[in-house]
């Protein structure tokens, strides 16, 4: 509830929803997604982010859950796509950047780092590398395509998460 009290402009009824959407995309969402390209985010964490985002969008639109308006309609009126897709987009952009770097770049060395020894008992933690491979499989892309910067940027832009 504190976010609503502090947000002033975003919850102001005099400002159009379209302008609020632009403000949300340029100020709030980047703060929410800060360094998201490096997160090995789980489905549960992604869901929490989407719930948080929808609560903010509903507050901005002046809509409550009691009004029974679908999330897709609210997203369409504010012109904001799902945050999970934006996180995936930023992860793919960072992956392309990493793939094109030299082999002696520290980020690339860390990505390929294999730690010897035994892991703890239980399910292995999701790694960034695993999440990237999952994203590539989901989209039907190949690792080598990231080496062509123009192609990679078009691919990412074609799968743009935000409606125009």
Regions found by a protein language model. Give the residues of each.
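Short linear motifs embedded in intrinsically disordered, charge-biased segments
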Residues: 1-164
């Amino acid at each position: 509830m504190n976010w609503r009290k502090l947000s002033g402009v975003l919850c102001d009824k005099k400002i159009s929803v379209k302008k609020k959407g632009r403000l949300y995309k340029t100020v709030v969402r980047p703060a929410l997604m800060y360094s998201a390209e490096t997160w090995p985010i789980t489905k549960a964490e992604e869901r929490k982010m989407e719930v948080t985002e929808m609560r903010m969008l509903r507050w901005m639109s002046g809509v409550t859950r009691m009004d029974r308006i679908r999330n897709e309609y609210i997203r369409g009126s504010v012109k904001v796509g799902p945050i999970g897709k934006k996180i995936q987009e930023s992860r793919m952009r960072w992956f392309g950047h990493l793939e094109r770097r030299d082999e002696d770049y520290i980020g690339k060395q860390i990505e390929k780092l294999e730690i010897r020894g035994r892991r703890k008992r239980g399910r292995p933690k999701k790694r960034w590398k695993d999440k990237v491979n999952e994203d590539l499989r989901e989209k039907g892309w190949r690792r080598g395509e990231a080496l062509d910067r123009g192609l990679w940027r078009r691919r990412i832009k074609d799968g743009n998460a935000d409606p125009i």
